[in-house]
């Protein structure tokens, strides 16, 4: 891509995603790298790029809750648990839901659950809406390096040809908080 954003950046990035490639995009705090969650090829590319074991599981980021329903067992939550989740969404809080049995292991890793987030970042909302589904979302950084906070940092770490949706992060200093949707237990402070 040579660091020049095409006129229709979202369409360009969606085309890259449809080719089972990994992309970078701004999130609430840092840039993320992501791909099509339904493509084992794309997810394996992302895991290889990040040097991340599949067993750890991944996060999905979505424009709305409906995009997450194919992957999570929403029926496992009580009305009160669902209300607690929706009180924090959209926003920078990731919740771990029970996964549907059909959710691929390349997303859940060794778990029977899946971490998911409904974002309030306008570019990520537009991207997920244009793509028609959520994205895998993990911080944009190579193993041992700090997460990227700008498109320029992404290109410096991943190379000038890496497909990046240019834009600003949401300005948060910390990555998303992670909580259990069933118990409310805090796994990672945001």
Curated annotation (Swiss-Prot):
Its main location: cytoplasm. One of its GO terms (cellular component) is cytoplasm. Residues 7-190 form the YrdC-like domain. It catalyses: L-threonine + hydrogencarbonate + ATP = L-threonylcarbamoyladenylate + diphosphate + H2O. It is found in: Cytoplasm. It is an enzyme of class 2 (transferase). Required for the formation of a threonylcarbamoyl group on adenosine at position 37 (t(6)A37) in tRNAs that read codons beginning with adenine. Catalyzes the conversion of L-threonine, HCO(3)(-)/CO(2) and ATP to give threonylcarbamoyl-AMP (TC-AMP) as the acyladenylate intermediate, with the release of diphosphate. This is Threonylcarbamoyl-AMP synthase.
């Amino acid at each position: 891509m040579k660091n020049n954003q095409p006129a229709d950046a979202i369409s360009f990035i969606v085309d890259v995603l449809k080719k089972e490639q990994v992309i970078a995009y701004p999130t609430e705090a840092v840039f993320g790298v992501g791909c099509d969650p339904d493509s084992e090829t794309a997810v394996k590319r992302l895991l290889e790029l990040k040097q991340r074991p599949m067993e750890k599981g991944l996060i999905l980021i979505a424009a709305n809750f409906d995009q997450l329903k194919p992957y999570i067992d929403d029926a496992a939550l009580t009305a009160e648990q669902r209300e607690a989740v929706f009180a924090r969404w959209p926003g920078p809080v990731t919740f771990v839901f029970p996964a549907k049995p059909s959710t691929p292991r390349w997303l859940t890793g060794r778990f029977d659950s899946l971490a998911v987030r409904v974002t309030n970042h306008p570019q990520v909302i537009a991207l997920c809406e244009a793509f028609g589904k959520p994205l895998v979302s993990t911080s944009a950084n190579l193993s041992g390096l700090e997460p990227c906070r700008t498109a320029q940092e992404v290109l410096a770490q991943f190379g000038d040809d890496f497909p990046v949706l240019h834009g600003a992060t949401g300005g948060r200093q910390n990555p998303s908080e992670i909580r259990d949707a069933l118990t409310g237990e805090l796994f990672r402070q945001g």
